[in-house]
Amino acid sequence: TAKEFDLLALFAQKPGRTFTRSDLLDTIWGYQFAGYEHTVNSHINRLRSKIEDDPTHPIYIQTVWGVGYRFAEPEELTA
């Protein structure tokens, strides 16, 4: 979907940066988004199913427990 692409583009532009759900909602959905904050989780899960070899053990889009999500830095992927 367009939102999944926007999420992937944002993560790829800033690898290693942790984004909170609020950061992602503000940036991708806009300040006027009145939906459920966990809609981010659904989009992340769908995106992982498309780009990860094993979405249950993500390498690229990582969960930072209690904070949000981050995209792995290139050096992490080659280690």
Residues of each region from the PLM?
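Intrinsically disordered, low-complexity protein-interaction/activation regions
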Residues: S49, D53, F71-A79
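Positively charged, aromatic-enriched patches within helix-turn-helix-type DNA-binding elements
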Residues: T1-S42, R46-V67
